[in-house]
Amino acid sequence: MSVHLQHVSIPRPPGSEDKTRAFYGDLLGLPEIPAPNSIQAAEVIWFRLGEDAELHCFREKPLGDASNRHFCLVVDDVADIRQKLNAAGYAPYDVEVIPGRPRFFCRDPFGNIIEFTSIVGDYLELQ
């Protein structure tokens, strides 16, 4: 089984779009990339990290325990890993669909959120 990191998702306060772009884009030099149309309402700002990883900065109010902070793992077979998690007593759950990127979320034993996905083609082009 092949597993690697696809993105890191971190919170940012409402109204911080300029500061987010200034720090990650201007200061750190990360190129901004468009988020899929299906999640634009979430006011996320995405940056490219290296060749195939991403940083997702999402608006969260208030910043606190009920967070959507998570990391994403690319897996060969989304259905297989979902079945394994279900069989082990975990509760995978679905979120907004991104075309070309089947995915689901699940909490680890400590409550951390993990996104599991497969990348099918160039999902940023499949809008």
Residues of each region from the PLM?
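N-terminal beta-strand motif that seeds the catalytic metal site of vicinal oxygen chelate
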Residues: M1-R21, R69-F71, D122-Q127
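Vicinal oxygen chelate
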Residues: M1-V3, A88-Q127
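Core segments of cupin and vicinal oxygen chelate
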Residues: I10-D52
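Short acidic/glycine-enriched loop/turn segments that link adjacent beta-strands
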Residues: I39-E43, D65-S67, I98-P102
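Conserved beta-strand in the GNAT
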Residues: L55-F58, E115
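Mid-chain, well-packed structural core segment of small domains
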Residues: S67-L85
